[in-house]
């Protein structure tokens, strides 16, 4: 619980003593997903005074509020999870007949991202209020992609908010899409695919694309943290 509270504080208006000011965010803040100004979705989020901020996963009725560089807590989480997820990622790519580009260490993998021009942090802290929601999407920010990511719920669905189920929709090969909705307990994480996963078919293994999102918050506020294991261009 202590770590959960510490992580939750990262979603407030300060990060490790850094002063933060507010400005209005639009969907143009999301790389490679900008929209015309007339269609832009406007929400308020803090932006660090030095201009550095992570990727903003701004979707309609969703707010990204993680402007500062990676904290030591989040860095430790990613360093601890990467070697456990790596065998799964390599196994998936072997089934799909793809070459696995991921080295044994997260630092080496991020160095490859930076060499390819993907230098922006993808750490996310998300805040949802009443009637907010997150459209189905994939967190793809460049050519280099790690196929697994983690979301951690920092709020209590029994006391802090209602609604706000985590959503997954899988586009199955030669079949109708299948949706899943789940309510994550406070402090619990969920590992899911970033882009696609191998699914056995009559013709062998096929890639099944998956998108994720969040259902509408009916009341209260919900905070969540996203751990993405590749950086962005």
Swiss-Prot record:
Gene3D superfamilies per record: q2cbj1_9rhob like domain (2.60.120.620)
Disordered: annotated segments: 21-43
InterPro entries documented for this protein: DUF2086 (IPR018655)
Protein origin, superkingdom: Bacteria
Protein name (Swiss-Prot/TrEMBL): Uncharacterized protein MT2286
Organism (species): Mycobacterium tuberculosis (strain CDC 1551 / Oshkosh)
């Amino acid at each position: 619980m202590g770590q959960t509270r510490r992580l939750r504080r990262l979603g407030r208006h300060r990060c490790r003593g850094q002063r933060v000011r507010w400005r209005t965010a639009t969907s143009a803040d999301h790389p490679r997903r900008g929209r015309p100004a007339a269609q832009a979705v406007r929400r308020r989020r803090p932006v660090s005074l030095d201009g550095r901020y992570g990727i903003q996963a701004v979707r309609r009725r969703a707010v990204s509020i993680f402007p500062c560089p990676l904290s030591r807590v989040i860095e430790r989480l990613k360093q601890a999870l990467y070697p456990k997820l790596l065998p799964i990622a390599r196994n998936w790519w072997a089934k799909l007949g793809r070459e696995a580009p991921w080295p044994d260490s997260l630092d080496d993998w991020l160095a490859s991202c930076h060499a390819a021009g993907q230098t922006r942090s993808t750490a996310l802290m998300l805040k949802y209020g009443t009637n907010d929601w997150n459209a189905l999407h994939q967190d793809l920010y460049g050519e280099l992609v790690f196929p697994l990511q983690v979301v951690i719920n920092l709020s209590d669905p029994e006391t802090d908010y209602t609604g706000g189920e985590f959503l997954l929709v899988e586009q199955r090969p030669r079949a109708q899409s299948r949706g899943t909705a789940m309510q994550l307990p406070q402090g619990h994480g969920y590992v899911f695919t970033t882009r696609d996963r191998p699914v056995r078919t009559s013709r062998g293994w096929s890639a099944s694309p998956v998108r994720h999102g969040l259902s509408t918050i009916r009341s209260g506020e919900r905070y969540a943290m996203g751990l993405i294991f590749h950086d962005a261009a």
